[in-house]
Amino acid sequence: MARQQRRGRKVKKNIPNGVAYIQSTFNNTIVTITDPNGDVVSWASAGSTGFKGAKKGTPFAAQMAAESAARQAMENGMRQIEVMVSGPGAGRETAIRALQATGLEITLIRDITPIPHNGCRPPKRRRV
């Protein structure tokens, strides 16, 4: 049998500022915090924080995901972030407020939602 390789301990990086990407869809919210180069420091989603099904799309689930990602980033020494928001979901504003409430200083908020110049046909309207 092959001998298992020993892995070194995870190195704690000291990254004072970074970028938070909030991808908010109708079904889920994903928060990714990177360093200025774009290397991921921490991430969390509504699904990874324990929500299932339709509850993943709620603002409260987005808040919990943002808090979880921010806590991990602050353990790596992060203090300032720029926020890039993408998507039409319910958790956009709530996730930004949650990042602010954890003690991270937000220096910039930018909406990077892609807008089509009449691209794909949108899904048909729901009839309930």
UniProtKB/Swiss-Prot annotation:
Task: Show the NCBIfam families listed in the entry.
Answer: PRK05309.1, uS11_bact
The family database entries (PANTHER family) matched by this protein are listed as: 40S RIBOSOMAL PROTEIN S14/30S RIBOSOMAL PROTEIN S11
Query: Can you list the disulfide-bonded cysteine pairs?
Result: none
Q: What does this protein do?
A: Located on the platform of the 30S subunit, it bridges several disparate RNA helices of the 16S rRNA. Forms part of the Shine-Dalgarno cleft in the 70S ribosome.
Q: Which domain of life is it from?
A: Bacteria
Q: Name one GO cellular component term.
A: ribonucleoprotein complex
The molecular function terms of the Gene Ontology recorded here are: rRNA binding; structural constituent of ribosome
- Does the record carry rRNA-binding as a key word? yes
Supply the name of the protein: Small ribosomal subunit protein uS11
Keywords linked to the UniProt accession: Ribonucleoprotein, Ribosomal protein, RNA-binding, rRNA-binding
Q: Does the keyword Iron apply?
A: no
Task: Describe its assembly.
Answer: Part of the 30S ribosomal subunit. Interacts with proteins S7 and S18. Binds to IF-3.
Q: Which GO terms describe its biological process?
A: translation
Whichever gene encodes this chain, its name is rpsK
Pfam families, per the entry: Ribosomal_S11
| Recorded family membership | Belongs to the universal ribosomal protein uS11 family.
Q: Which positions carry the signal peptide feature in this UniProt record?
A: none
